[in-house]
């Protein structure tokens, strides 16, 4: 297969892919040394990433914020179907959504990570790079995902698609970190994965007695929406950012006026993610029963009304993938997904079956997870294809056989050959398991009332609290660390200085803000929470 045959363009109309060819990665690994991948291209212009730039301490940049790599050329048609290896529909549905996440796919096709990866053990970024490249270069075929993708997670039974999705995203984020060096959590939030999927919540508490204000910032990789009383995603978002009144037993103990007074708590998005993962909370935490109701979601979503800063223009996101669960509880049923290929056509991805469908069909599903991308990001990454190569008609040579992992591995030194595939799975299992991943997630689990709304007890006045991401990239002895914090507030009396088991404090020297009402304290402190 020539280099040109890997890049498909123009209009490719078809109604259904059945199992034309089934390729197994362990067999394909033996051939890994032939066809080259797309050439690396210059990095494209602006990207929008501004996670707490004015608040966070200086951190080591693990990925340049303004330089997300773009592949100069990539397939424009839909890629391969995925073989179900037994209760792996949740894995297949998640992988298809990630494969059609343009910033991630273009980064994988640029080969930037695999060319510099020095991890001695299994690397999720390298494994995902091989999978995404293989899937996109195998249109009309069915491929078998590598066992290493779910090693440590799959236990031979149906799993939750959202858990596997975030397990994979977290593993990729971990792979961005230098394994042999200690990295502070501020630097962890500069990884490429966080730049794509990450944003930051802002919870602002205003004392209605003295008008003192305290802000809490909490990073996120996905947003969970309560749909009990919502008929649409917009309603769920409106409920999420609706100001909450704190009074009576829930009155706020203000650190400025030192009174237990009524207050308002407003939750907004301080920074927006390039790719927005919205999780509709359909399953109960205990019994796993499903809330089977229709919740409307738009093809285009303006997130500006939910942002902290309201003086800018629309912030438009476009839908590009939908995860659907069919069944009555999280313990049964199956998962499938809908994805939008780069030319704009929607496809239903149901394991091995790839079916063309309309946007009307996509918007009529009982969605579980929704994937939105900033419109500007979609256009920027889509344009990288047309700049790289002119579209051409589909030729017979393109449908003879799929591109195998063997052909695609020449520039993937981190991947293993077939005889070492079992070791690859074993190493992946040793590095991260579902139970190890779930432990810190349970400690930081989003409760129905959303823990980003949780009011910190007796916060000092004008404190900025920044929580560490709940998606931790490592654990010591598999237990969450509890660290004490020291408050250095020159404006407070020693009797007001309390020890808080919430994290490590980093003060903002010289940072001031305009006082409101009786608030005459000009210095603010930054409380960074584990």
Curated annotation (Swiss-Prot):
Coiled-coil stretches noted in the UniProt entry, renumbered to this chain: none
Region annotated Disordered, chain positions: 382-410, 493-530
Biased composition (Basic and acidic residues): 382-392
Gene Ontology terms: biological process: protein deubiquitination; regulation of apoptotic process; regulation of protein stability
Keyword Endoplasmic reticulum listed: yes
Main location: nucleus
Compositional bias annotation for Basic residues: 511-524
GO cellular component assignments: cytosol; endoplasmic reticulum; nucleus
PROSITE patterns per the UniProt record, alphabetical: USP_3
GO-annotated molecular function: cysteine-type deubiquitinase activity
Domain USP, chain residue ranges per copy: 80-375
Stored InterPro entries: Papain-like_cys_pep_sf (IPR038765), Peptidase_C19 (IPR050164), Peptidase_C19_UCH (IPR001394), USP_dom (IPR028889)
Top-rank taxon, per record: Eukaryota
Polar residues bias spans: 495-510
Localization: Nucleus; Endoplasmic reticulum
Keywords noted in UniProt: Endoplasmic reticulum, Nucleus
Similarity field: Belongs to the peptidase C19 family. USP17 subfamily.
Record PANTHER family: INACTIVE UBIQUITIN CARBOXYL-TERMINAL HYDROLASE 17-LIKE PROTEIN 4-RELATED, UBIQUITIN CARBOXYL-TERMINAL HYDROLASE
The name this protein goes by in its record: Inactive ubiquitin carboxyl-terminal hydrolase 17-like protein 4
């Amino acid at each position: 297969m020539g280099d040109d045959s890997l890049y498909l363009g123009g209009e490719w109309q078809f109604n259904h892919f059945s199992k034309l060819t089934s390729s197994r990665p362990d067999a394909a690994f033996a051939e890994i040394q032939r066809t080259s991948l797309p050439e690396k291209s210059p990095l494209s212009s602006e990207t929008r990433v501004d996670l707490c730039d004015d608040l966070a301490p200086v951190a080591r940049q693990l990925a340049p914020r303004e330089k997300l790599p773009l592949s100069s050329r990539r397939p424009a048609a839909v890629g391969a179907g995925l073989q179900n290896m037994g209760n792996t529909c949740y894995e297949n549905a998640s992988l298809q959504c990630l494969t059609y996440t343009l910033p991630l796919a273009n980064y994988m096709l640029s080969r930037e990570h695999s060319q510099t990866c020095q991890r001695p053990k299994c690397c999720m970024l390298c494994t995902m790079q091989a999978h995404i490249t293989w899937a996109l270069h195998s249109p009309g075929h069915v491929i078998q995902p590598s066992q290493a993708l779910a090693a440590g997670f799959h236990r031979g039974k149906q799993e939750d698609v959202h858990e596997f999705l975030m397990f994979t995203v977290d593993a990729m984020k971990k792979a961005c970190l230098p394994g042999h060096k200690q990295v502070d959590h501020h630097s962890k939030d500069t990884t490429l994965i966080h730049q794509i999927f990450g944003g930051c919540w802002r919870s602002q508490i205003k004392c209605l007695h003295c008008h003192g204000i305290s802000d809490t910032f909490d990073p996120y990789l996905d947003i969970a929406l309560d749909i009990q009383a919502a008929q649409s995603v917009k309603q769920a978002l409106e409920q999420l950012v609706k100001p909450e009144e704190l009074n009576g037993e829930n009155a706020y103990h203000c650190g400025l006026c030192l009174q237990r007074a009524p207050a308002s708590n407003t939750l907004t998005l301080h920074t927006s993610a390039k790719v927005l993962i919205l999780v509709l909370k359909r399953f109960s935490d205990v019994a796993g029963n499903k809330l089977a109701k229709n919740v409307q979601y738009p093809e285009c979503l303006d997130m500006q009304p939910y942002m902290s800063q309201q003086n800018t223009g629309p912030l438009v996101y476009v839908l590009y993938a939908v995860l659907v669960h069919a069944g009555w509880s999280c313990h049964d049923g199956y998962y499938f997904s809908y994805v939008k290929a780069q030319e704009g056509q929607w496809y239903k991805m149901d394991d091995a079956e790839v079916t063309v469908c309309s946007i009307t069909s996509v918007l009529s599903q009982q969605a579980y997870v929704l994937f939105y991308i900033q419109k500007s990001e979609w256009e920027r990454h889509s344009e990288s294809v047309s700049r790289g190569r002119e579209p051409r008609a589909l030729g017979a040579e393109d449908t003879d056989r799929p591109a195998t992992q063997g052909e695609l591995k020449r520039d993937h030194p981190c991947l293993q050959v077939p005889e070492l595939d079992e070791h690859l799975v074993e190493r992946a299992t040793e590095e991260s398991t579902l139970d190890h991943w779930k432990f810190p997630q349970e400690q930081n689990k989003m409760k129905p009332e959303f823990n980003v709304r949780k009011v910190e007890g007796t916060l000092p006045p004008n404190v900025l609290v920044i929580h560490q991401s709940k998606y931790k990239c490592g654990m010591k002895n598999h237990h969450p660390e509890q660290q004490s914090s020291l408050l250095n507030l020159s404006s407070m009396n020693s009797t007001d200085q309390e020890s808080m088991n919430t994290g490590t404090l980093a003060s903002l020297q010289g940072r001031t803000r305009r006082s409101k009402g009786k608030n005459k304290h000009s210095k603010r402190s930054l409380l960074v929470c584990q």
